[in-house]
Structure formats: C-alpha cells, structure tokens
Amino acid sequence: MKNFLAQNNLFAVSAGLKEAALNTEQTLNTSMLLNISSIPMALDRRSEDNSNEAHGKEEPDTIYRFGATGAGAYPVERAQAQHFAFLLSYGLGASAPAAWGTGFKHTITPIASIYNPGFTSALRLGNTIMKRRFASNYIDTVKATFAKDSWAKIEAALKATGKYTDNMLKETVNAAYNALSLTLAANAVHGGDAATRLDNVHRIRVKVPTTGEWQEVTYSAVSAATPAVITIGAPGGVITPTDYEILYVPAEAAWCTFPARVTEPPLRVSNLLLKIGGKWDGSVFNGGRTLDAEVESMEYNLTNQMKVEFRTDPTGATSGKYANYAMREGRIQTIALNREARDFILEQMMIDEEYSGIYIKATGAEFESGKNYFVEGIFPRCAVLKAPLIVNGKVIAQAGDIRILEDDTYGSCKWIIANKVSGY
C-alpha cells in the first residue's frame, strides 16, 4: 500500500559540496531533520491565461505556461550545531573548517561576492509517493532564535532556480485495446518485491479508439524483468491498436538513495552566553556586559535579498523551463533583543550613539572530553536603533532593535561552530 504519511518525508542536501556552477547538480551528502509540517522546497509554476486577449469568448480558454522557480522554508524547532553551520555557511557564503580534536571548528564569514554559493536538495514525500531533486538552492533569509526555557531554533527561507528531476516517468505504449499485459520500452519498475513494484505504478490509462477520451485501466502485477511487463485488465473487447499512458517509478538513479543523517544533540538556550557593549580584537571579545536571566529572547536575522530570475539564454540550455540567474542584492543583518528593563543601559547606548560589539555563544553537550558542540556569534560593530519600553505581564521590558554594521577591520560578523562534520 502507498504510504503518504508526512512522518516518512525525507530531505537531503549537498551540505558539504557547493555547486560548481548555476543549475549544475551536486552529490547529496547529508539528510536533514525535517519539521513534520514543512515542505522545504517546492516548484512555483508560472502561468497566464488569455483573459486579456479578444478570442471570441467571454472566458479564457488557453493557459500559457512559462517555467517555474523554486521556493520553500526550512524550520528547525530543536536546532543542532550542524543546522547553524549548514544554513549560515550558505547564507553568508564562506566557511573554513579547522580540525579540533576529533571534530572541527567552522569559521563562517560573509563573502564580498554578490553570487552566493548554491546547493542541491532532494525531497522524498511519504514512503512511496515521489522523490524530487532541486538544483541551485539559495538561502534567502535566516532567523535564529534563542528564547527562554526552550531549544535554540533556526529557520531559513529558500529560493531555487526551478530546475528539477523527478524519479517518475510517463511512458506511452501502443498495444491492442483488448491487451492483457503491457511491456515497457526499456525500463524496469523500481522495487525489490512484487508489492513495491505494484505500488510504484501510479496510473495506467488508455485512449478509447472510437471516441478519443482517456479511461483508467486496472493493473494487478508488475514483473521484475527489464523491461517490465505489467498485467492489466483488458479495457475493451477489440484488437484495435491504441495508446496506453503509464506513470511509474523506473529503476532509480543514484541520487534517489538518500544519504545518512548526522546525529547531534540539540542546543538548549539555558546554556547561552550573551554579551553586549564589548570589543572584538580579532581573536578575543573583550569587555562588555553579560546579560543573564533578564533576557526573554534574542533573535538574529540575515536577509540576502536573493533575486532569482529568467534571463536571456543564448545556449538554449534552460528551454525557458527554469531560471538562469541568481544574485544577492544586498545583505542585511539585525538582532532583536527582548529583555526585562532592569537598567538604563540600552537607553544610554542610544543617547551616546554608541557603536559596540555583541557576542553570543550557545554551548551543547561534549562530543569528546573537554570539547563541546557550540555555536558562537561575534558582531564587532552594532548600534541600538530603538528599544521601546513595554509591559510584559507585570514587569517592565524592552524590545531592542539592533542593527549589525560592517566594521572596517573585522567585517560585520563571524560565526564559529563546532561539531564533528568535516566541512560545509
């Protein structure tokens, strides 16, 4: 029986292998945990009808289709170091690993180029419904949230060119209208047993010879041979040749085998260090005030303003089916800090028009003695834009709006993430 429960969905990416060029698929090397309610990437098909054309009818009668792009969201409710490393590496653009015991520290920084690295993704829906691979995925936005009494969270908005590959195939076979079996042209049907092969045939329909409409055809068995032979119920009683359309999963390509998932413990916000007002000297964050139980939440936001478009294609490689242009229009980074208003510090920083650094570090469990999973964020130059006073329940609080700026020497940010993955 076909299994279409969302718990069986799988999502894989080329986390450690960026694409060499636009619309050039890479090898999938990591399966990622997936929120059960999330479809991380889907096609956004583009079409228009002819309602603005005079065509002799009141209502439109034609649809013009012109390709697709891709879009999706990838939220992680219990974020691990690997999720930060993957999303920030592709969101900011540069990641440099260095060995650290049996693990690695990944130093992630913004690139100057307006062309961010792309990765390949693939999605399995249910257990037997379909698999689809997407080329050239890009991180449009990232939001990382550290809120009281919760797990660290991270989510990304994704954009893609719309180039995709399915594990499905539609094949037309010409046979008699009263045929009892159909033989595929060359392919086997995927599956190691009879029940799986039968599930992997999604539909057979026949064109009625006399009237021209399509009718569904029953089928009961699929052979293990190459090409496969499918046993059907004869749709008619005459020998007249006609077309049968068969929608099925052929013997799968290598990309259809999803890679292993990396297992890490999630990060808990109770193990968060947050400093504001200090200075980064390139190796150490000096000074600053450590914020502790007063913090309700801290949220980091990255926006890349990714533009994915159809442009002229002299080679004709895209056939107008997917975009051939992806550019980052300008990076914006902000921090939202919600805290109890126990002091006048944020107000004074605004009065003084102060530029200063912010430092965060979320520490997880050890992966070896003395070495922990961690996510560390350094922002050398920040400014508090506003911090309106509010009443949160029965306490006075502040919602700080902080802009991350680009420092002349150290740039806008540096993330250092430790885990056991060799690179992103």
Predicted regions and their residues:
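Signature of extracytoplasmic/envelope-associated structural regions
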Residues: M1-Y424
